[in-house]
Amino acid sequence: MSRIHPTAIIESGAQLDESVEIGPYAIVGANVTIGARTTIGSHSVIEGHTTIGEDNRIGHYASVGGRPQDMKYRDEPTKLVIGSRNTIREFTTIHTGTVQDKGITTLGDDNWIMAYVHIGHDCQIGSNVILSSNAQMAGHVIVGDHAIVGGMSGVHQFVRIGAHSMLGGASALVQDIPPFVIAAGNKAEPHGINVEGLRRRGFSADAISALRSAYRLLYKNGLSLEDAKVQLRELAAAGGDGDEPVRALVDFVEQSQRGIIR
């Protein structure tokens, strides 16, 4: 029995594993590759130079691999690459990259992308990320592993969301969120360390304590950003479970181009 509904349109050149399931009225473009056991919901459109891994579930009416919403785009063969075991719910839009960046949009593994999410051109979404319903990622946004973005939130282009961080619902984010930090509001402001999330992911009490100390240096002690970075480096060399996560935090802060939320 065919796993492709008779009303679906599969353009010549598309490469589909024989176990892929395609729902009614879905369209798969000529330059699309889809891996084993992936399911495509009814009325979805998978187009562009798009590669999708294994065991993904793409919901009804999703638009995956569409042209970037960038007025400079001139039909260059830019790409979208999606990993494995992702859930991409109904009405989500994910666009290919642009040549002004690296020419590719990426989505890692084991992500939970809820309904009506937008992932713009050149975004880099890590693994084990949750993007809640109606979260909107502008172009060039980077989201680290295990980050959570609340529903109805808007993220400005080129913003970075650090690993294990959390952005509350209905927030407007215009600068970077450091790893491990909770942020919320319009505009988004810091609200502490994501303690519960870190506990769930097996971070030790010592590591969480070190991150809390790092947060105080960054946000609570009245230090300038430059002075805070010096003390964060000292904290990262203290010895113990907290060294690596604190080092990741200060590296992120030092590499920020848009500045961090303060």
From Swiss-Prot:
Enzyme class: transferase
One Pfam entry name: Hexapep
Claim: Acyltransferase is one of the keywords in the record: yes
Listed GO CC annotations: cytoplasm; membrane
Location (main, coarse): cytoplasm
Sample GO molecular function, one term: acyl-[acyl-carrier-protein]-UDP-N-acetylglucosamine O-acyltransferase activity
One annotated GO biological process: lipid A biosynthetic process
InterPro entries from the UniProt entry: Acetyltransf_C, Acetyltransf_C_sf, Hexapep, Lipid_A_LpxA, Trimer_LpxA-like_sf
Pathway in which the depicted protein is active: Glycolipid biosynthesis; lipid IV(A) biosynthesis; lipid IV(A) from (3R)-3-hydroxytetradecanoyl-[acyl-carrier-protein] and UDP-N-acetyl-alpha-D-glucosamine: step 1/6
Signal peptide (from-to): none
Superkingdom, taxonomy of origin: Bacteria
Catalytic reaction(s) noted: a (3R)-hydroxyacyl-[ACP] + UDP-N-acetyl-alpha-D-glucosamine = a UDP-3-O-[(3R)-3-hydroxyacyl]-N-acetyl-alpha-D-glucosamine + holo-[ACP]
UniProtKB keywords: Acyltransferase, Cytoplasm, Lipid A biosynthesis, Lipid biosynthesis, Lipid metabolism, Repeat, Transferase
Enzyme nomenclature, EC number: 2.3.1.129
Free-text function comment from the UniProt entry: Involved in the biosynthesis of lipid A, a phosphorylated glycolipid that anchors the lipopolysaccharide to the outer membrane of the cell.
HAMAP family, per the entry: LpxA
Similarity comment: family membership: Belongs to the transferase hexapeptide repeat family. LpxA subfamily.
Summary of subunit composition and partner proteins: Homotrimer.
Name this polypeptide is given: Acyl-[acyl-carrier-protein]--UDP-N-acetylglucosamine O-acyltransferase
